[in-house]
């Protein structure tokens, strides 16, 4: 059993689908206040902050997992778009191009051990027409996800190819978590 320090329904579903027993507690960490770090350090910092806050709030003897994801596109960090206009603008740029989806992970074990790592997956977005972009943005899905797309949803139709960990793009590297759980359960 572990405690997931995340408000992400996608991460919760990944753990459910992988049959990893867990509970969810939202950390309340304000992700918008930190912008001065490069994308890899940003997601790692936020993952560690989320896990740390939840670790302090719970009394249960559970490992705590914090995660955070952003899309890096042409050197720019794309978190969740704030508006449909912003989502459309991003998709105009991303269509037919590669981006890097970074997910920071931090697992705090019961005995105080801290495991931290960022996993990066290359994402090739499909070449899209303006009407395809408008239709996707109109679903509202892009406003809910880092990078403005959900691989496990309709956004999966807009992704041509991945290089790296599939589940990482959804918000959590399951292979990394498996390795970590083996380490802390030894």
Curated annotation (Swiss-Prot):
* Residue ranges of coiled coil: none
Name the source's superkingdom.
Bacteria
What's its EC? 3.6.1.9
Query: Which biological process terms from the Gene Ontology are attached to this UniProt entry?
Result: nucleotide metabolic process
Check the record and name the NCBIfam families matching this protein.
maf
The job of this chain, per UniProt, is described as: Nucleoside triphosphate pyrophosphatase. May have a dual role in cell division arrest and in preventing the incorporation of modified nucleotides into cellular nucleic acids.
**Upper lineage ranks?**
Bacteria, Bacillati, Cyanobacteriota, Cyanophyceae, Synechococcales
Q: Please report the name of this protein according to its UniProt entry.
A: Nucleoside triphosphate pyrophosphatase
- Which residues are responsible for catalysis? 68
- Which Gene3D superfamilies does the record associate with it? 3.90.950.10
Q: Which reaction does it catalyse?
A: a ribonucleoside 5'-triphosphate + H2O = a ribonucleoside 5'-phosphate + diphosphate + H(+); a 2'-deoxyribonucleoside 5'-triphosphate + H2O = a 2'-deoxyribonucleoside 5'-phosphate + diphosphate + H(+)
Task: State the compartments where it is located.
Answer: Cytoplasm
State the family named in the UniProt similarity comment for this chain: Belongs to the Maf family.
User: Could you tell me the keywords of this UniProt record?
Assistant: Cytoplasm, Hydrolase, Nucleotide metabolism
Q: Pfam family of this protein, just one?
A: Maf
């Amino acid at each position: 059993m572990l405690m997931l320090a995340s408000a992400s329904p996608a991460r919760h579903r990944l753990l459910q689908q992988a049959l990893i027993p867990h509970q969810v507690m939202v950390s309340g960490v304000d992700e918008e206040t930190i912008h001065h770090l490069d994308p890899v350090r940003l997601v790692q910092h936020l993952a560690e902050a989320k896990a740390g806050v939840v670790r302090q709030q719970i009394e249960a003897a559970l490992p705590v997992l914090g995660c955070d994801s952003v899309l890096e596109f042409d050197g720019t960090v794309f978190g969740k778009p704030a508006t449909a206009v912003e989502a459309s603008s991003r998709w105009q740029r991303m269509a037919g191009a590669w981006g890097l989806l970074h997910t920071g992970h931090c697992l705090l074990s019961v005995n105080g051990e801290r495991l931290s790592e960022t996993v990066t997956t290359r994402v090739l977005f499909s070449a899209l027409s303006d009407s395809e972009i408008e239709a996707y943005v109109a679903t509202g899905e892009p406003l809910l996800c880092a990078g403005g797309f959900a691989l496990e949803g309709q956004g999966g139709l807009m992704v041509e190819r991945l290089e790296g960990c599939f589940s990482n793009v959804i918000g959590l590297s399951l292979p990394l978590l498996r390795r970590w759980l083996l380490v802390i359960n030894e």
